[in-house]
Design a protein with these regions (language model features):
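ABC transporter nucleotide-binding domains
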Residues: 2-4, 9-207, 211-212
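Short secondary-structure transition/capping segments
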Residues: 71, 119-120, 263, 298-301
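An acidic, carboxylate-rich microenvironment
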Residues: 55, 71, 93, 108, ...
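ABC transporter nucleotide-binding domain
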Residues: 172-265
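Solvent-exposed beta-strand sheet faces enriched in polar/charged residues
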Residues: 5, 232, 289-291
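C-terminal coupling/interaction segments
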Residues: 267-335
Length: 335
């Protein structure tokens, strides 16, 4: 449902996004991660037909983001980091207004509004002005707005920003349910635990380029190498004398006392051989397990590489340039 081929965006001499290729299938959630300024939001704006690409192509539900921009805007739900609400309106009026802009009839608007306000715990605040909402409540209203027309494609840019833990959990649970409804979802977030929990696949962007794309397991192996295992012997045995006899099987990371840490590319094949060799030396193994690795480990490796990489020179007022371009496109579209 979401396809991008060599999609690029340039502001003057600054390349914000460089020839990225992406695909998000129905029922899939792809998390787009990267440092600040990596190109995440620019990518979302282009895919959402808000910002025109400089080159390359993208299609949403088979529609081109340039030639079919107005049609696409009716098929996507977009949640940005900053909600941009009309604070003087009450919640129900606000949602009814946006539903009418999207062409929903009165009965559908009312039904969708009631359903979503209850789902996100905002029912009791439905007649309050949005100015009186907390930051977390405003973000939830913005998510309801993105879902009001039941779109097949969702772009979620930092959806749980400023939310308390309970509200964030409510939103994460809802996102999981939305994915099960065969929606294609692109999520950008700095919450690595959230991405690890929700994403089917993860793309990591740096300097406007996708530098890694795959499942968490695939990225862990690609960026962190083969998995690490930890083996412990019974006290008082010592692992060190046995290490030379294991060198052809494993790559030793650390060996001290009763504990051995090692990398192993084919654990189902190698670990039984390893245990057999230790047993032959009368070294009793009391524990053997893979050392857990998190998405944070993967992300920190990327950030470390980013810090060492050459940077493009900064462009003054880059955000203003982007905002002006978006405004010009909306004027041209007569919106």
């Amino acid at each position: 449902m979401i396809e991008a081929h060599r999609l690029s965006k340039q502001f003057g001499t600054f390349h914000a996004v460089r020839a990225i290729d992406l695909e998000v299938r129905p029922g899939e959630l792809l998390a787009l991660l990267g440092p600040n300024g990596a190109g995440k939001t620019t990518t979302v704006r282009m895919l959402g037909a808000i910002l025109r690409p400089s080159s390359g192509s993208a299609r949403i539900c088979g529609l081109d983001v340039v030639t079919d921009a107005q049609t696409i805007r009716g098929k996507v739900g977009l949640l940005t980091e900053y909600p941009g609400l009309y604070g003087r309106m009450i919640a129900t009026e606000y949602l009814d207004f946006f539903g009418s802009l999207l062409g929903l009839d009165v009965a559908t608007r009312e039904a969708r509004t009631d359903l979503l306000l209850q789902q996100f715990g905002l029912w009791d605040a439905r007649e309050r002005k949005l100015d009186g909402y907390s930051k977390g409540m405003k973000q939830k209203i913005a998510l309801v707005r993105a879902l009001i027309h039941d779109p097949p494609v969702l772009f979620l840019d930092e959806p749980t920003t400023a939310m308390d833990p309970q509200s964030a959990r409510t939103v994460r649970d809802a996102i999981g349910e939305l994915r099960q409804a065969d929606r294609a979802i692109l999520l950008t977030t700095h919450n690595l635990a959230e991405a690890e929990l929700l994403a089917d696949r993860i793309a990591i962007i740096r300097g406007g380029q996708i530098i890694a794309l795959g499942t968490f397991a695939e990225l862990s192996r690609q960026l962190l190498g083969a998995p690490i295992y930890e083996l412990r012997l019974a006290v008082p045995h010592n692992i060190a004398p046995a290490v030379p006899a294991l060198a052809d099987l494993i790559t030793v990371e650390d060996a001290s006392g009763q504990t051995l840490r090692y990398r192993c590319t084919e654990p189902n094949l190698i670990n039984p051989q390893l245990l057999a060799r230790l047993a032959a030396r009368n070294l009793p193994v009391v524990a053997l397990a893979e050392v857990p690795r998190s998405l944070e480990d993967v992300y920190l490796r990327i950030v470390a590489e980013d810090a060492a990489a050459p940077k493009q020179p900064p462009v003054p007022h880059q955000e203003a340039l982007a905002a002006n371009e978006v405004l010009q496109q909306l004027i041209e579209a007569d919106l």
